[in-house]
C-alpha cells in the first residue's frame, strides 16, 4: 500500500510476525545491510539504535555517509538523517500480537526510492519469518 499524506509518501506491508520481532530487526544495526538494499555496511557504537545514535553507512556505490537518529519512539517509529538529508522514517503499526504493518515514509520528492523501500519491506518480512521458525 502506498499513501501520500502531509508531504510524505509511505509504503507499507503487513507482516504476520509479532511486532517485537520486526522492531528488533529494524533497530539492530548488525541487520541493516541484510534488509536495506542501498546499504552494504554499517558502523555504529550502538548495536540497537536509540535517539541520538550516530554512525555511518556504506552505500552500494562504496562511499560512506554519516547518520544520526533524529526521532525515536520505542516499538513505534524512528527516523534518521543520512548525510545532510532527513531520510526514511520507519513505523510499526500493531495489528495483533502476531502481526503488524510496517511502513517506510519519505519526502514526496523521494518517490524514486519507493522500489528500494518495497524491497526492504520484503526482506524484513523474510528475516522475521526466519527468526520465528528458528526458535
PLM features: what roles do these ranges have?
Residues 1-45:
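Hydrophobic ligand-binding cavity/cleft-lining segments
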Residues 6, 60-62, 84-85:
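Glycine-centered tight beta-turn/hairpin loop motif at sheet-sheet or coil-to-beta transitions
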Residues 13, 65-71, 87-95:
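Hydrophobic/aromatic beta-strand elements that line small-molecule binding cavities or substrate pockets
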Residues 22-26, 32, 55, 69, ...:
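Hydrophobic pocket/interface hotspot
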Residues 43, 58, 63-73:
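A short, surface-exposed loop/turn module that caps and links secondary-structure elements
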Residues 49-56, 72-80:
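Short, hydrophobic/aromatic-rich segments at coil-to-beta transitions
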Residues 77-135:
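Beta-strand/loop substructures that line and gate deep hydrophobic ligand-binding cavities in soluble
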